[in-house]
A protein has these predicted regions:
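Internal metal/ion-chelating core segments
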Residues: 1-70
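Alpha-helical repeat scaffolds
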Residues: 3-14, 36-48, 72-85, 110-125, ...
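Generic helix N-cap/helix-start motif at coil->alpha-helix transitions
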Residues: 16-23, 52-61, 88-99, 127-137, ...
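Residue at a conserved register position within TPR or TPR-like alpha-solenoid repeats
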Residues: 29-30, 67, 101-104, 108, ...
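A conserved active-site cap/scaffold subdomain adjacent to cofactor or substrate pockets
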Residues: 55, 60-122, 135-137
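C-terminal non-catalytic interaction modules
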Residues: 101, 153-157, 171-242
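Non-catalytic interaction/regulatory modules that flank or connect domains
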Residues: 131-134, 138-151
Length: 242
């Protein structure tokens, strides 16, 4: 699958070297390979970023992940501060920033000042409950602050929204058990772990936050070992930083 994705991305870039979605596909491959060669690609470095919208910041997020995987934390923070940190209220920008900073936090890097700057955006999204993808980022964002008020009202507010929309099954079968496990310290069902949380939305690079956050916060060694095992089976570079 990875080889096919790489081939398709490269073929597409031969037709249009300015197609950011093709670069995005290639970066997914590079993330998995721990490959930073895109930084030396002449076509990539010639891109006029000023004409593009949020997708460019998502691409820079992918670049920062490669630096993270290589334990170049200061370089990755510089990329965050100079490029993909955004003052716009767009859900993907918030999710990108949140997931990146939490990764660094789990490695012992002080990100509190940067996390604090995301609070207004978190407040904007936290009661909407329109996408499980946004909500799982919010859950781990507020867990960083140990915000018990947020978690006490979370399930009730989510149920009001998700039980009435098309994400009902996604919420009941996947998101709710994660919340319940975190609140009660109960074991997370092994089948949920084996699903790689794909029904909560986003690519594996984005859902990676769920794995890393649960590994970091679970109180059960069985949950931790199951999460690490499933994660290592998928992510070829995972042993570098889990």
């Amino acid at each position: 699958m990875i080889d096919k994705a790489k081939l398709l991305a490269l073929n597409s870039l031969k037709q249009s070297s300015n197609d950011l979605w093709s670069w995005h596909a290639l970066l997914h491959v590079h993330d998995n390979e721990n490959n930073d060669s895109i930084n030396n690609n002449d076509d990539f470095n010639k891109i006029n970023w000023s004409i593009y919208g949020p997708i460019k910041r998502h691409i820079w997020w992918h670049q920062s992940l490669i630096l993270f995987y290589n334990q170049e934390y200061e370089k990755s923070l510089k990329l965050f501060d100079n490029y993909f940190s955004s003052s716009e209220i767009f859900y993907l920008d918030f999710c990108n920033a949140c997931s990146f900073l939490l990764r660094l936090h789990y490695k012992g890097v002080d990100v509190k000042e940067r996390m604090d700057k995301l609070k207004d955006y978190a407040e904007y999204f936290k009661n909407q409950h329109i996408l499980p993808f946004i909500d799982y980022h919010l859950i781990f964002y507020y867990l960083y602050y140990n915000d018990q008020d947020y978690f006490q009202q979370l399930e009730e507010k989510m149920e009001e929204n998700y039980l009435e929309n098309s994400f009902k099954e996604n919420y009941i079968n996947y998101l709710k058990p994660i919340i319940h496990s975190m609140k009660t310290n109960e074991l997370l069902n092994e089948n949920i772990i084996k699903s790689q949380f794909k029904y909560l939305g986003g690519s594996f690079a984005q859902r990676e936050l769920i794995f890393l956050s649960l590994i970091q916060n679970t109180k059960y060694e069985k949950n931790k070992s199951d999460l690490i095992s499933e994660y290592n089976d998928y992510k070829s570079v995972s042993k570098l930083y889990v």
